[in-house]
Amino acid sequence: MGKVLVLYHSASGNTATMAQLVGEGAAAIPATEVRLREVDVATPDDVYWCDGLAVGSPTNMGVLSWKMKRFWDETMFNHWGKVDGKVACAFSSSGGWGGGAEIACQSLQMVLMNFGFLVFGVTDYAGKITTCHYGAIAAREPRDAEVKEACRLLGRRLAEWVAVVADGRREQHPLAKPESRTLPG
């Protein structure tokens, strides 16, 4: 069974809403166990437990929040090199469109790569003009149907990769399920 951890910091509740949606998406893949943890209560054992990790943070001046950075700098510092090879992705909520959420996702991915996580983007579209190539993003609370679907899509794709990488379930590979994909054009 694949294990997915959705680790998040939410200053206003918006990123927490995204975390719930990412978790819903991951749970849609059979044989996937999902846990949500707020960064203030998360421990290294939570990170060890998972096969795949979705990390969410509010956008703070274009990058990840200080609480999320502190978790990796302090809580996970002595665990460097011990979580190599787990699959991971990112999501972020900003104060508005153009508020830096994609850059915040990239800053989260940089942290994850430094710890040895295998990060990915999603080529599928969550709607006519909504993607999550760098992670799922929202301007404030995810209200829009396409933004909500992007969060779920990110979670589903994470659980698919966990199924393939950790459980060897090749039938869950995105290319093995063309009917479930939404590509541009």
Where does each model-flagged region fall?
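Residue-level preference for long, well-ordered alpha-helices that form the structural scaffold
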Residues: 11, 64, 101, 140-147
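Short helix-capping segments at alpha-helix termini
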Residues: 25-32, 78-82
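Helix-loop-strand module that forms the ligand-binding subsite of alpha/beta enzymes
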Residues: 40-127
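Glycine-rich phosphate/pyrophosphate-binding loop and the adjoining helix
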Residues: 121-185
